[in-house]
Amino acid sequence: ALRIYNQMGQYPIDIVANYGMQESTVVNGEFVEVRNDRCQVDKEFFLKNAQLIREKHGYTEYAGESVEFHDAGMVTFGLLGTEAKREDKLVFDPDRAKRRAIYKEVCELFKGYTVYIGGSTSFDFTEKQYNKYDAVMDYAHRNGFTRDEILYIGDDFSDGGGDSHIRLGGMDYIHITDFTR
């Protein structure tokens, strides 16, 4: 949440981040962390299943580590590895077609986790209870808002996208397709 707060020029706003794992507010002009959930991760499970995907689909050569384990308990499985060159990442899967082709298989293999097509080369994983729809609705209920009073703005509503649970949950949203304008 602190990263987002700083990216927004320290604008005094409540922030729900990392699919609901983090929450912050601003009190008297100061950033205040409200919640910062952490989950235990079965690293062996992720490494084993990532290797199965690599071998089956030909992603056995990669730079750095196969899987990145974040402090909060989120996991990133980058098909090009954790240390892939930026230029390789940018041309690897710009339309996400390579990852969409194996998305259902990855979801099946990693049951018990929410799977997102993340970044430019990766799949991101959170525990099932962490997704943007549930995070926004939890925040809304605690602050006296109904779903009908919420308008979500995002850019990744397709299946596997970080905002997909918003669409699937039936929340009103605006889909940003070109954030440069």
Where are these predicted regions, by residue range?
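Conserved acidic, metal-coordinating active-site core of Asp-based
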Residues: 56, 60-151, 162
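Residue-level marker for buried hydrophobic side chains located in beta-strands
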Residues: 15, 152-153
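Asp-based, Mg2+/Mn2+-dependent phosphohydrolase catalytic module
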Residues: 142-147, 160-181
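A short acidic, often aromatic-flanked loop/helix-cap motif at beta-alpha or helix-coil junctions
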Residues: 21-26, 122-125, 180-181
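Short, glycine/serine-rich, charged loops/turns that create anion-binding
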Residues: 20, 81-84, 157
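Active-site phosphate-binding/coordination module
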Residues: 1-64
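Residues at the C-termini of beta-strands that transition into short coil/loop
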Residues: 16-19, 119, 177
